[in-house]
């Protein structure tokens, strides 16, 4: 059974609809939906007795989240970074400091990384400063992502905070040559 991956900018309304659709498929006895229920649910109910909370848990775990609330939290965090909503980002990471160090998209091998790196991809400098002050430690991956996305001002700001990237060191040597 393969896992799902959140898109770069997930949509909570779409995930809610996916959960409802999954519940409908489970209750209807769709073999792949029932297999998913049995694979991802620790105590799967019989298909006719499945509730929305069961479908939400199955969906969350298929996205590699531990629970539906954790999946919702990830989507809210990513959405707040996209909207440059520093207050919502602060509220989410102070209520759950582990978020500072987990992949924002809850998927392994994501180039978007933890929230600081995710914000660097988008050039969200105020959010980066705030996350850094709160203890985010992924400056090296963040500076690399900022450079890849052409966010030079963001990369310079991170370099002043101690981030080092082979590209930055090379570029600095070239600027002085």
Provide a role label for each language-model segment.
Residues 57, 116, 128, 155:
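Short glycine-/small-residue-rich flexible loop motifs, especially phosphate/cofactor-binding loops
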Residues 88, 126-127, 153-154:
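Conserved ankyrin/ankyrin-like repeat signature
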Residues 1-91, 95, 118, 122:
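Intrinsically disordered, low-complexity eukaryotic regions enriched in glycine, serine
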Residues 143-159:
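Leucine-rich solenoid repeat scaffolds
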Residues 73-79, 101-118, 132, 137-148, ...:
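Ankyrin-repeat boundary/"N-cap" motif
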Residues 93-99, 129-137, 156-164:
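Ankyrin repeat domain, specifically the short helix-to-loop turn at the C-terminus of the second helix
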